[in-house]
């Protein structure tokens, strides 16, 4: 009789579940789909008609006119991507970011145009900040070289209200002022916009990965830096405190920015909080991959897929990425 000696072979061989693509697909733990993605759109008030302008540090990414942004949103919706996030570049900048809450501002007109064309077929998120609209490029009111927290809150609230008046689905404060979520939630409730959600950039780090975005949005600070309000890159527990405060103040969704260097923060937040959590795959991450790919140093499509999958695997429920259209159009795979 044949006898099995358990010492002669391995009972557990993880490679059995890797031997071909079908079995790998069957047991894959994390799957990336277009429903996970949000596409950014830069809307430039200085552009007319269907004019668009390529962003030099972000190949294949553009600033659009209002009309062009509406057409771009229609293309995005047709691809099955569920949401866009809008960033505005105004004609006029001043010390108090007055163009940011103008009812006929560049973002407000774009929101109305998208909603008139698409209704609920596409979620419209609007970034809520001052930096693109201030003459000094900071995310708050400045006095004597200091960024004032409490003086900034009413302006952020006015911006959010103007977006809600235009028909936005979600407002996304990215300024990192203390108390901004409460200020926004209160003004929305007072004006009957209880169904407008807040996606707070709760853990937004003072990162070096934002450089290309600041060119795209013309939002670089004219003096100093943003380290007095954006988070220190070495801190993790502080991120959890920021997230907890924003949820307590009324945030419906929270965002970690950047995503790839802060996957640990996404994972910690996912384990701790019961709200949808997103990661922003930022301009520097995009530019880094595109530059390396142009030099033939890596397999572009596989790297994009791996980056986005890693963000989801870390715990992100949604991902803001400049590759959203491409992923939806052609699909990407690790194989």
From Swiss-Prot:
Positions of Zn(2+) binding: 129, 131, 139
Class of the enzyme per the UniProt entry, highest EC level: lyase
Catalytic residue positions: 204, 257
Statement: the UniProt record of this protein carries the keyword Iron: no
Binding site for 5-aminolevulinate 1: 214, 226
Pathway noted in the entry: Porphyrin-containing compound metabolism; protoporphyrin-IX biosynthesis; coproporphyrinogen-III from 5-aminolevulinate: step 1/4
Residues where Mg(2+) binds: 242
Task of the protein: Catalyzes an early step in the biosynthesis of tetrapyrroles. Binds two molecules of 5-aminolevulinate per subunit, each at a distinct site, and catalyzes their condensation to form porphobilinogen.
NCBIfam families the UniProt entry points to: PRK09283.1
Protein name: Delta-aminolevulinic acid dehydratase
